Amino acid sequence: MKEFNNLPLLSGIYSFSVDKLTFDLICIKNDDASIVKNFWQGNYDRLTLTQWLKITEKEGIYFDIGSHTGLFTIIGLLSNPKNFLISIEPNFINLGRMRSNLRLNDLLKNNSQFLGAASNFSGEGFFSTHYDNTFLSKGGRISSSGEKINIIKLDDITINDNRKIRGIEIDTEGEDYNVLLGAEKIINNFRPDIIIEVREKNKLEIFQFLAKYNYKTWLISDKVTSNVIPVKLSNLQITSTASVNIYATIENIN
């Protein structure tokens, strides 16, 4: 966000488009990085969001893990109005903004929100958040200290719906591999499409886990490519301070 510090602060309701979809999002003094970057640069996370749009076109149940202010949840609900989205967000301020964004777009139905974090166990833990005047854009993470929060593994969530779990989006600032471990039964039973944030320190663990269930992996990060390309995570070089988005599926894609 530093590159936008000398530009006017954005406050209001802003239109956001992903392929065929257009919806509104709230921003107050640059507090949502996705809106700020999209406003000044356009096509924010185009590859990732477009891929999620394609995934969620099929009716089913979807998880948005680390849902922040609801961008992926909104896309999943608009992509197919019959979908059901389960959104997990540990920061109550972000969750409040997500609910406001859902209400703004008349999307309060077919969505369940959980205030907490996802991992490989269910219980309590601590969540460390970096606050400043753009706190909605800052990533927090499960830590040894911070705010006490509820933690849940996806396999422990009771879903009273017989429809297939078709997709999981995971953006948890380094907890991503543990989220996969906590969803192993779901992944084994349903083989959902997965979009996951990957770092150098967890790429091998994530690759080995996905390979065990015969997933193919594709790079969908606008930061490093303009197209969806197949990639073997064990060969992918990621800088220590960066992350990339990976699309994992058992299907062949064009």
Residue locations for each model-derived region?
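Short N-terminal helix/helix-N-cap motif within the alpha/beta-hydrolase-1
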Residues: L71-I74, G96, G123, Y177-L181
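Conserved acidic-Pro-Pro-aromatic motif
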Residues: I13-Y14, N80-F84, I157-N254
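Short internal loop-to-helix segment that lines adenine-nucleotide cofactor pockets
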Residues: W40-F63, E124-F126, K138-F190, K201-E205
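Short, glycine/acidic-enriched loop or turn micro-motifs at the edges of active sites
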Residues: S67-T69, F92, N120, T172-G174, ...
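Conserved beta-strand termini and adjacent loop/short-helix elements that scaffold enzyme active sites
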Residues: I28-N30, F114-G116, I151, I220-D222
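Short amphipathic beta-strand/extended segments with alternating polar/hydrophobic composition
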Residues: D24-I28, I151-I152, N227-L233
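S-adenosyl-L-methionine
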Residues: M1-D155, T158-N162, ...
